[in-house]
Amino acid sequence: MEAYLDNSATTRCSERVQKIVCAAMDEAYGNPSSMHKKGMEAEHYVREAAQKIAKTLKVSEKEIIFTSGGTESNNLALIGTAMANRRSANRLITTQIEHPSVLNTMEYLREQGFEIIYLPVDQKGVILLDALREALDP
């Protein structure tokens, strides 16, 4: 019997999703940024997906950004948020047990002049609340 314990990173697709994705890959394999027919077909699938996600999340379609994966998403979220708030907030708080994509991005932000606070965690990986309080109100 197989036990897959990394569902946070990737999870098996349902058969229904597999069929939809395979159909899209078969029918609309063009570059969605291109102006040719296959590109426009692919862009239709991308826009339709963005609309459905936006509706589900009750946000604007323009707020949906597709990335290649978790690392790119973490970089975009962390760097974008940090740089947008640089004048009002220069301290970032994290832990040493984050995913490498977060730790590497925090190191990059430290090199850009941000103060990075690494909170300690207990044996179960839970943040020590006293350390968090101190980091929030030095």
Tell me the role of every PLM-derived stretch.
Residues M1-P138:
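Pyridoxal 5′-phosphate
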